Amino acid sequence: MELYKKGYSARTIAKILGCSKSTVCYRLYKLGITPRRGLDLNPQEIIKLYQNGYTTTEIAKIMKCSHETIRRILRNNNIDIRKSSESLIIKNTKKINLNPSESLAYILGVLNGDGSVNKQESNYVIELKVTDKDFIEEFKRNLENIGFKYINEYVRKFENKKDQYVVRVRSKGFYYWYKSLNVDYYMNVIGNNEKLMISWLKGFYDSEGSVVINKKGNYVYKYVSIANTNRNLIDVCCSFLEKLGIEYSVYCEKNNRYKSGYL
């Protein structure tokens, strides 16, 4: 009876016990249990698929049975059913490409600036909130390029302020990978490829950059400025600019906000 509750078919139980299928069915009838018809499912295979990240719906399609049948087999084998948010995290994590690429470098540049990567209760959230629609669309496009398929995008409306565009994805794998990065990764991985450096600078500038115009007498000075309070990031920025042959200068304001201005 325990084997049957766990999802094993009468035929499989007969093989395990070394008896005939009819004997198993007879014993089930004696216990007041009507044998299931038309299914010969392997609970261990179902459990393995589930633990490898497949959803109950995906497993049901593979096994050609109902979604509820898979859930029942998992519950009867003491397997906790994941919440939909947890399934979403696994789906995103399985398909994300974290190998160095222009899209990944751009994403890192953004996250080093306005973006955020945080753990919110049981969720691992990558998020960007900005008022520039083109910026948010570019960030979203690059997320899709590295494999994010389930992207939450919405607009926050305010009475006396500009609309705020928000893009949010969830990924436990990306969260822990991102938190493990240090300056060496930027210097030795991104910093050894011209296209990657340009992509990172683009993302960092989209987050932290601005065009400054100063007038002094008859002269007009125009330059690009990137401001950030993290000196390590400014050092990375300066290293990339130097490798790309772009002149720059660095100074620190009284409030310890570092700026990298370059022509």
Curated annotation (Swiss-Prot):
InterPro entries with a match to the protein in the record: Homeodomain-like_sf, Homing_endonucl, Intein_endonuc_central, LAGLIDADG_dom, Resolvase_HTH_dom
Name of protein: Uncharacterized protein MJ0314
Start and end residues of each DOD-type homing endonuclease domain: 107-246
Source superkingdom: Archaea
Any single Pfam family the record assigns to this protein: LAGLIDADG_3
GO molecular function, one term: endonuclease activity
